[in-house]
């Protein structure tokens, strides 16, 4: 499910992996759907009247693309009585680096407990082509978009930090002795972990009985 901002290389790699794994696939452009959405919602006038800046629109339109893809995946899954498999890894899920009800919308997360850096090692064992393993991670939601630019850290540093915070329960004084990051950078990631919990938890509901649903 590609758009005008999907790098050609990514489409080529998707086809390559489908062929390697002998998976039947179809390619669907989501541009018509997203453009029609912008027309129906009168997005251009809303941007002018409400003074919505381009950075906010960029993120909102990127999230829309992810949610369109999720809707299409579930449509095809319903037709075939399939489940939807997620692609989120532990690094992304812990800091909320995914679109709620977009790429985060799935039935199972097979690699959800594996850090990005661990996946690179596993990918070599699984025979994934080196071109795919070594290219910069990106979602292609807008031109030039790259994961590590948005996160503000390389995955190597992020995974080391997450391991110390989550798996080892280390405080900042301990962490800073073991990694070349500032207190501000460490706290920024801690905030992402806390502030994104709603993305991986069921919606909260007022308790009016003694039993949970």
Model-based region annotation:
Residues 35-36, 94-95, 140-141, 194, ...:
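Short secondary-structure boundary/hinge segments and terminal tails
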